[in-house]
């Protein structure tokens, strides 16, 4: 498979049989094979595209999100590829690896005090949004499109890949 757009390879991850390890018919979805390395690529793409479809996110706007890591990586991957300025806000004590990945994807990073946990990041996003109406805050923790991504995509893939043989 050759693709011009990395977003085309988010999702459609394989089902992996764990029978050799467990002796049972247990399967796992290989979401770690998404380009950002986690299931969060799928929800990031879904939340951003749903916001675009509703008109909540338009060209020229900035995508902002508070995260401790993997969702920020997914949002950076998707948002930057779609041409948006992406700003990720996270506590300063998150791993250097995550910070470097987010920056390498082209997103900006704002670090908040680790003593404020994720709440500090949420407050900073609210402060930034109040100053600039052209900021779209994803709000993964409250966003109904987050779980809907799995209902509309992950579940359908599992059903199809397992040919309906699920108990």
Q: Each predicted region: which residue ranges?
A:
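PLP-dependent amino-acid enzyme catalytic core
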Residues: 1-167
